[in-house]
UniProtKB/Swiss-Prot annotation:
Protein's cellular compartments: Virion
Biological process, per Gene Ontology: symbiont genome ejection through host cell envelope, contractile tail mechanism; viral genome packaging; viral release from host cell
Record-level GO cellular component terms: viral capsid
Protein family (similarity comment): Belongs to the Tevenvirinae portal protein family.
Keywords: Capsid protein, Late protein, Viral capsid assembly, Viral contractile tail ejection system, Viral genome ejection through host cell envelope, Viral genome packaging, Viral penetration into host cytoplasm, Viral release from host cell, Virion, Virus entry into host cell
Cited function: Forms the portal vertex of the capsid. This portal plays critical roles in head assembly, genome packaging, neck/tail attachment, and genome ejection. The portal protein multimerizes as a single ring-shaped homododecamer arranged around a central channel. Binds to the terminase subunits to form the packaging machine.
Cited Pfam families: Portal_T4
Keyword Amino-acid biosynthesis: no
Sequence intervals crossing the membrane: none
Quaternary structure and interacting proteins, as annotated: Homododecamer. Interacts with the large terminase subunit. Interacts with the major capsid protein. Interacts with the capsid vertex protein.
Organism in which the protein naturally occurs: Vibrio phage KVP40 (isolate Vibrio parahaemolyticus/Japan/Matsuzaki/1991)
Source domain of life: Viruses
Protein's UniProt name: Portal protein
InterPro entries xrefs: Portal_Gp20
């Protein structure tokens, strides 16, 4: 931790030398726990532990993550999560899972080659080919993911060790000073608190005693990526996950499925009705007589919502609750009849409705949800079209990938600076131009490109009669076919070359 402590000392020195002052702290975009103080940490390594008390309406991180993980165990939610993760992390035999695009950066070719080498090293440390699916799914479900950077003697990362998100907390210490009677913000110092124990320490306990179960970690020692979704007031925001929208529809779907099974078990079979002749027995003895007969033939069936099993004492599923009605002497005598079962037990439209509602809450096209006559999914065939929902879903997945790429770019930044490949200033100037490209499904991409090209060809045929009269050929190339100037020049050069090539010349029959 000595390297990270030194880095934190440099951050403190930057705060001291920073001439910028403001009455407001920078926006809290990472959901950090804020501490306001007029003094920085007197001694690095000693924890400054925030109070365990939660603001009104704030859900503890541990409870939030537990609720998301429990939700992900429902098979309908798990299927929906798999749709998202499969779209974000694509495995193909001849392609990498993720690669780096440096075309828009200001680096030289030599520097770009070194950056790509370090990028491959980081991808290898994360084992994206093997564990990329697991990391992305864990990040999506928990709404956050942490890795500890473990260094060798040369300060190179040799391992990225995953940490339990329920034991981590990001703290932002807001350094203030008073100028002319006005309290202004001098700077901010961020660090992590790792809670070794789940025991909730009282706020009055000293920092020394609290540090026995919690300790402070410099910010640069941890790789942290979160969903980017916030809830709570501006003074105390906290991170929520993308599954937060799915909690209500998922619980409604599960409740409806359980209720539907119970209803069908109760109403599907025909029930027996026993009319028991009690003769002239007194009311009390008549009731005892009916109860005796009932106990001899009674069978109660219980449905277990946890396992989906039907349990009873006799293990006979054909029998349910029966009706026992006494009859007085002079009636028809003892009789056993049946009540018909329920009707329309095959209707599951309400279940399919809540299943579609769950997919909508998770921003997944409802065409991928299972329906009554098909299993769901994307179907491309003759005349098939890519719907607007699919395009919106593709954009949503790209936003998720952009949030997740911090898992790769954070350790990449460390490697580049430690090995003196680039400076921190060069990273700050170019990191927005550096693109982490995730592999996409080839079949889907080809189908999308073919559909776009087909639409452009149809539009070009419709406007062909007006070419050279109302619209120039260059206008058609740039606005209908969407070709760039370089593409137009290259295309014209290829056309001129093919005109002199006998292979592309037509014969007398037009071939």
């Amino acid at each position: 931790m000595k390297f990270w402590t030194k880095e934190e000392e440099q951050d403190i020195q930057k705060i001291e030398k920073n001439p910028v002052r403001s009455f407001s702290a920078p926006d809290n975009v990472d959901g950090a726990k804020e501490i306001h103080t007029n003094l920085l940490a007197p001694q690095l390594g000693h924890a400054i532990i925030p109070s365990d008390a939660q603001s009104e309406g704030t859900i503890p991180v541990k409870e939030l993550i537990k609720s998301y993980r429990a939700l992900a165990e429902y098979h309908e939610v798990d299927d929906a999560i798999q749709e998202i993760v499969d779209e974000a992390i694509v495995y193909e035999n001849d392609k990498e899972v993720v690669w780096l695009n440096l075309d828009n950066t200001d680096f030289s070719e030599n520097i770009k080659a070194k950056i790509n080498e370090e990028f491959d090293r980081v991808v290898s440390l994360l084992q994206m080919r093997k564990h990329g699916y697991k990391w992305f799914r864990k990040w999506y479900v928990d709404s956050r993911i942490y890795f500890h950077k473990i260094l060798d003697k040369d300060n190179n990362i040799i391992e990225l060790r995953p940490l339990n998100p329920m034991k981590m907390e990001l703290v932002r210490e807001i350094q203030k000073e008073t100028i002319d009677g006005v309290e202004v913000v001098k700077g901010t110092l961020e660090y992590y608190v790792y809670k070794q124990s789940d025991y909730k320490m009282p706020s009055w306990m000293s920092a020394t005693n609290r540090a026995q179960t919690s300790f402070r970690i410099p910010k640069d020692a941890i790789v942290f990526a979160h969903s980017g979704l916030m809830r709570g007031c501006a003074d105390d925001p906290y991170i929520i996950g993308y599954l937060d929208r799915a909690i209500k529809p998922a619980n409604q779907l599960k409740m409806l499925e359980d209720a539907l099974v119970i209803y069908r078990l109760a109403r599907a079979p025909e029930r027996r009705v026993f009319y028991v002749d009690v003769g002239n027995l007194p009311t009390q003895k008549a009731q005892q007589y009916v109860n005796g007969i009932m106990q001899n033939v009674k069978n109660r069936v219980v449905y277990d919502t946890q396992t989906g099993q039907v349990k009873n004492t006799t293990n006979a599923m054909s029998m349910l609750e029966d009706y026992y009605l006494p009859r007085r002497e002079g009636s028809k005598g003892t009789e056993v009849s049946t009540l018909p079962g329920g009707q329309s037990l095959g209707d599951i439209e309400d279940v399919l409705y809540f299943n579609r509602k769950l997919y909508k809450a998770m921003r997944i096209p409802t065409s991928r949800a299972a329906s009554e006559d098909q299993t769901g999914g994307i179907n491309f065939g003759q005349g098939a079209e890519i719907t607007r929902d699919e395009l919106k879903f593709t954009k949503f997945v790209k936003r998720l990938q952009t949030k997740f790429e911090t898992v790769i770019t954070d350790p990449l930044k460390h490697q580049l600076i430690v090995n003196n490949i680039i400076t921190e200033e060069e990273w700050d100037a170019n990191h927005e131009k550096l693109y982490v490209v995730f592999n996409q499904d080839s079949y889907f991409e080809e189908a999308k490109e073919l559909e776009i090209l087909n639409s452009r060809m149809n539009a070009m045929r419709d406007i062909q009669d007006y070419a050279g009269k109302y619209y120039s050929h260059k206008y058609i190339q740039k606005n209908i076919l969407r070709l760039s100037d370089d593409q137009i020049t290259a295309m014209q050069s290829e056309i001129d070359e093919e005109e002199t090539n006998p292979r592309f010349q037509q014969d007398d029959q037009g071939f």
